Amino acid sequence: MAIIIPKVKTNGRIKMRIRKGDIIQVISGKDKGKIGEVLRTLPNENRLIVEGVNLRTRHVKPTSGGESGRIVTKEAYLHASNVMAYSTENKVASRIEIMVDSDGNRKRRLKKTGEILA
């Protein structure tokens, strides 16, 4: 029998259930509907960087070394509340629940599909 652990507030913040390497779908904002892999998380700020989502351009001035100026495009942070875990098998976004199996191991799984996340 698995026990399900609810979200717990610690130090005034909600624990993030999304980890680096997870596949997510953006559920709100200008990039709504886009799917990507989480590259980095900032749990204290409840933000994350997703590959190919929320792209920002920056104009870099030329340096004195003779390099020419250029335009750099890179991903900016997203708030964790704007994304959901995504099942690539079933093509559906879902919330994550943490369950403890009979051996005492904690595992993350998708609520809609029951798929276990690594």
UniProtKB/Swiss-Prot annotation:
Species of the source: Paulinella chromatophora
One BP annotation, GO: translation
Superkingdom field: Eukaryota
InterPro entries named in the record: KOW, Rib_uL2_dom2, Ribosomal_uL24, Ribosomal_uL24_CS, Ribosomal_uL24_KOW, Translation_prot_SH3-like_sf
PANTHER family per UniProt: MITOCHONDRIAL RIBOSOMAL PROTEIN L24 (PTHR12903)
Disulfide linkage: none
Subunit comment: Part of the 50S ribosomal subunit.
Protein name: Large ribosomal subunit protein uL24c
Keyword annotations of the record: Organellar chromatophore, Plastid, Ribonucleoprotein, Ribosomal protein, RNA-binding, rRNA-binding
Membrane-crossing residue ranges in chain numbering: none
Family to which the UniProt record says this protein belongs: Belongs to the universal ribosomal protein uL24 family.
Keyword Membrane belongs to the record: no
